[in-house]
Amino acid sequence: SPSRGLGDVYKRQIRNYVETIKEGESGYRIYIKDNVPLNRSDREAYDYLGIEPAKVADAKKKKENLDIEIRDFMCKNFYDIRTFGAVMTTFVKDKLNCGQVRGPVQLSFAKSVDPIMPQEVTITRVAITTEADAEKKGTEMGRKYIVPYALYRAEGYVSANLARKTTGFSEEDLELLWQAIMNMFEVDHAAARGKMATRELIVFKHDSELGNAPAYKLFDLVKAERREGVDTPRAYSDYNVSVEEAALPSGVECIRI
């Protein structure tokens, strides 16, 4: 955010974690993957239902529930569709109503609590690509950007109603999501991310399917504030993270993981 100097973080690690932990286990495959054409996964639904891609229109005339059967197949087999939803362009192009699935889980971009100061680091590459390069130069220079320290806050939503009516997202899937959020950086370390980690997960659990309070009111109860005397935060311990649990609405429980 240029105007405030706040940093943003985008999600990808959850899918990577689930794929690593489940390793091809039935029902936990990942739909959105690097360098894998989406229509390859889409065709699996056609194969499962015995439909030739060129004859989808004829199959739809014979099966009134074809859209639902395809959607259910994709949700059952791919964890990220069941969780986050997906836009499956193969089915959209074939004029099927299952091409866009709304997922019960939505996560916002994470934003830094305080302004950040990215630093540019110069690195030296000692390896040479070709023999011709070796004759001309000894090393190559490069740049890398790092953020020495920042505390980020992300907010998310889980719709029990959509989970039940649309994708079949289950309690077991939810537990796996919590596990992924807490541990996703532990299986995918990188020099640029340093010691990046999820420090706490705060969950508001409602006792009704449609919820007992608006999400924004619950998010406002969570505060991340610098401790007294700290001008430049350099560690998680420089912050005090609190939840105003006394102000929780009836039927809402706060779980801190």
List the model feature ranges, each with a label.
Residues S1-L6, Y10:
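Single conserved hydrophobic/aromatic residue that forms the stacking wall/gate
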Residues K22-I257:
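RAMP-family (Cas7-like) RNA-binding scaffold and associated basic/acidic loop-rich RNA-contact surfaces
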Residues R12-T20:
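Short active-site loop/helix that positions an aromatic residue
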